[in-house]
Amino acid sequence: MSSVLVVSTLMFIGMLGVLFLWDSEHLLAARYFFREQQRAHLSSAVVKYCQDTSFCIGFRQDTSLMLFPGLATSEVGFYRKRWGLYEMLLLTAGDEKKCCLMGKVDEGYSRAALYLPERGRTLSIAGKSRIEGKLYIGGQGVAYTQVRSEFFDGTPVAPSDICRSGAMLPSPAPEITAYVGELFRYAIEEWPEAENFGQATFAGLVEYRRIGQEIKAMGLTGPYVLCAADSLYIRGDCRLRGVIIVAGKVRIGTGFKGAVQVFARDAIGLEERVVLQAGSGLWVNGGTRWRSVRLGENCRVDGYVVVRGNTEQPQSPYAHYHQPSSAVVRGLVYVDGIADVRGVVEGSLYAGELCHFASEGYYADLFYNVSVCRSPGTVYPFLIKGPVERREVK
């Protein structure tokens, strides 16, 4: 009798164990599929935000949206803030979170490959040049010519792609210039010094640090804002991602690779083989007539280059932006001044004037050995007012 009772007890305990394991696996599976559903809601929310932002109240304010009316688990929280010339979007669904850097599908209403304001001059195109997309130019049109003994050997612009430009470049949006102005007014004396290594999260607070005249072997992952009182040299051994840099003049050393947005009062220079990854940008505020951005050989910028204007001009032509033939910019180049561009621009080029500088002098209004083409996957910064459709920076 006692042995039967023992066996029955053991069988009962065994059945309880099996039921417990089954229930645990069921709960784990349910939890897994629930979290997968929440992640899917976050991805759907990004698509929704890219197409329509009217449900968002403003910046730095929490907004929620129920993706499927009547389904409480489909509610997603939105929080967005400006991050340089992009938007930082934080999404929450239950315990799941997603952080995205957002840009625009189009640079502005013009959707231009090349935009030159009306100056009463003809644009000369020479060498292996091509313009794929809309060309905005004054009423004098284009002429295909030669430089030295090199005749035009590129792709002619389709007549249907030539449009009439305005008297001036489209102006940057006031809210963007106001935001950048705030960057230059930071009182950095009260900030702590930057550590050599650090990692923050965009779901938290922005870290503000002051830096000296040179940074080396620094590894930071944003959101960080680093400010220097005057000139700054960034050595190529630094590894920076999601970082905003503010200084008077900035030079980035050979071989640097990272994702940074650099805002300078006077000038920015890139040495050789600098790679600025997606979500990067270079902005010079136009504080002097000698303002400039200069790219070195074999550089790549995935984001934007902006050189603001200044009413005081040098007596002789001066390149406010120089891009060598081995450099590539993917995104928007906006130069309120003279641009000396060679190489490739995948996206849009806006320039007050084009000049080709050579050893024997300079050629005004010359587009020579340049490729400017609209790329369907390009992400543009928030600079010029235009269509609201967003695209995630990847």
Predicted segment positions?
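Beta-strand/loop motifs with alternating small/hydrophobic and polar/acidic residues, enriched
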Residues: 1-118, 389-394
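Structured N-terminal alpha/beta-domain signature
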Residues: 25-26, 42, 46-49, 208-211, ...
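Short, ordered "entry" segments at domain starts
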Residues: 79-212, 216-221, 225-228, 236-239, ...
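Hydrophilic extracytoplasmic domains
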Residues: 248-249, 260-261, 265-267, 277-394
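A cross-family detector of function-defining hotspots
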Residues: 270
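RNA-interacting cores
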Residues: 273
